[in-house]
Curated annotation (Swiss-Prot):
Gene3D superfamilies: Hypothetical protein af1432, K Homology domain, type 1. This is Ribonuclease Y. It is an enzyme of class 3 (hydrolase). SUPFAM superfamilies: Eukaryotic type KH-domain (KH-domain type I) (SSF54791), HD-domain/PDEase-like (SSF109604). Its EC number is 3.1.-.-. Residues 212-278 form the KH domain. It comes from the Bacteria.
């Protein structure tokens, strides 16, 4: 068995070796074939490369020959061109030399001619000098003969002649001037009427006559008792704080707020309306509502002033001036609302300045600010003209605005078209029938004077004229004025009013000194 296995294994090994040997021979034979093929291909490539190199050498020789030929041709052309240029330059040089020679000969001829003329001129000059002298001698002889015959000298004759000419000319000039003056007056009147007609027809202003009372509506007459309060505390607080008269009478569902000061009256009216809506009518709540209304009115005046500046399209303006414009809503002059009057003047001035060829925007700006001092009159000393000039100078307003403030009351001459338009518009607005009431204005001046007299004393916090000017209520600082000094202060104010203000009847001076202590429990 073992022998069989060994014999089988030997046969297999021998078969494998024979197969390996045969495959090795076949592989070597194939490799030799590949090598021969590769050598044949390499030889073919080498032959082809040599052929290409040969062709390239031939091509390069042809290109070199062509380049040499082109170079020679270009060289020949350049030489020919250079030769032509040299001939042209030589020809131009010869031409220039001939031109130069001709010009030199011409200049020599002209110089010779000028010298000859100069000699002739000198000869003629001598001849003219002698003729001039002979002419002057003849004129002197003629003048002497005329003076001898006329019996007057040359200066006298000249003066007489000039006097006659001047007399005749003066008469003619006066006639012409008078004719042109008449024509100018007629034309100016026509032009002025046209401008006024244009201004008044293009602007329709509102009529605003201010009253002295405001009406506050009540939902129920029982509210009158609550407004008066226990022992009159509420109404005393209201009148003292607001500085107005609160009139509670038999008028159903209404109370009246009376004051000549439009600003205080408007604040009082708004305060009462808010108190009625709130329902809590007591001194502490009254002060709280009053302070809130004052803050709201300050903001509203600024907002209204900004709207007016934007509507008029007059450019940027300082916020303080804008606020003062809004405050004009609560000022009046001869019963005419100051803001309505100011707006009317601004619009009219803009239209008239435009018709006359001026700056319409500047005229409107000057018209809007011409009475700005009225917004400060009750707070500062001085006329509204001086106050207006001060505030406008402080905020660097245009010189035309300053001139308009002065000129509309005749304090300065009119210096511009815009200023003239403002003055004309102011007169037009004030002279309109029904625009102003003289009696009301005199009353307001009297009441304002009473308040100013009371306010100028030391220790006075506030002073209000009430009851149509028949009573002045003076609120003093309790820490500065004692009870005895209050009596003396009332007498001093009464004496000054007697000597400084003209008024019918009598005026009651009521000095109020209130001491209040406030503390908070925390």
């Amino acid at each position: 068995m073992l022998n069989e296995i060994l014999s089988g294994s030997s046969a297999a090994v021998i078969s494998g070796l024979v197969g390996f040997y045969i495959s090795k021979k076949i592989t070597n034979a194939n490799f030799d074939i590949y090598v021969e093929k590769a050598k044949a291909q390499a030889g073919a490539i080498e032959n082809e490369a040599q052929l290409l190199l040969y062709k390239a050498n031939i091509k390069s020789q042809e290109i070199e020959q062509e380049a040499t030929k082109l170079y020679e041709n270009a060289k020949d052309r350049a030489k020919a061109d250079l030769s032509l240029r040299e001939e042209d330059v030589n020809r131009k040089e010869q031409t220039f030399k001939r031109y130069k020679q001709n010009e030199e000969r011409r200049l020599q001829d002209e110089v010779s001619t000028l010298k000859a003329r100069q000699v002739d001129l000198k000869r003629n000059e001598k001849s003219l000098s002698s003729l001039k002298k002979r002419y002057e001698d003849k004129i002197d002889e003629a003048l002497n003969a005329i003076e001898h015959c006329a019996g007057m000298t040359k200066e006298e004759a000249t003066r007489v002649l000039l006097e006659k000419v001047e007399e005749k000319s003066r008469s003619e000039i006066a006639h012409v001037v008078r004719r042109y003056e008449n024509e100018a007056k007629v034309e100016a009147k026509k032009r002025a009427n046209y401008i006024l007609a244009q201004a008044t027809s293009r602007f329709a202003g509102e009529f605003a006559a201010e009253r002295l009372t405001n009406l506050v509506h009540l939902n129920d007459d029982e509210l009158k008792g609550r407004i008066i309060g226990k022992e009159g505390r509420n109404i005393k607080t209201l009148e003292t704080l607001l500085g107005v008269d609160i009139i509670i009478d038999d008028t159903p569902n209404a109370i009246l707020v009376s004051s000549f000061n439009l600003y205080r009256r408007a604040i009082a009216t708004k305060t009462l309306e808010l108190l009625i809506q709130d329902g809590r009518i007591q001194p502490a709540r009254i002060e709280e509502i009053y302070n809130k209304v004052c803050e709201d009115f300050e903001a509203d005046t600024l907002s209204e002033g900004e709207e007016i500046v934007i509507d008029l399209d007059i450019g940027v303006m300082h916020p303080e001036l804008v606020k003062l414009i809004g405050k004009l809503r609560y000022r009046a002059s001869y019963g005419q609302n100051a803001l309505s009057h100011t707006l009317e003047v601004a619009h009219l001035a803009g239209i008239m300045a435009s018709e006359m060829g001026g700056d319409a925007r500047l005229a409107k700006r000057a018209g809007l600010l011409h009475d700005i001092g009225k917004a400060l009159t009750h707070e500062h000393e001085g006329s509204h003209v001086d106050l207006g000039v001060q505030v406008c100078n402080r905020y660097n307003e245009h010189s035309v605005v300053i001139n308009a403030i002065y000129a509309h009351h005749g304090h300065e001459e009119i210096n511009s078209i815009e200023c003239g338009a403002v003055c004309a518009a102011d007169a037009l607005s004030a002279a309109r029938p029904g625009a102003r009431r003289e009696v009301l204005e005199s009353f307001l001046k009297r009441v304002t004077a009473i308040e100013e007299i009371a306010s100028q004393h030391s220790g006075v916090k506030q002073a209000y004229a009430i009851n149509a000017g028949r009573e002045v209520r003076v609120i003093v600082n309790a820490s500065l004025i004692n009870d005895d000094e209050s009596i003396l202060l009332a007498k001093e104010i009464a004496s000054e009013i007697e000597h400084g203000v003209q008024y019918p009847g009598e005026i009651k001076v009521n000095v109020i000194r209130e001491s209040r202590a406030v503390e908070f429990a925390k």
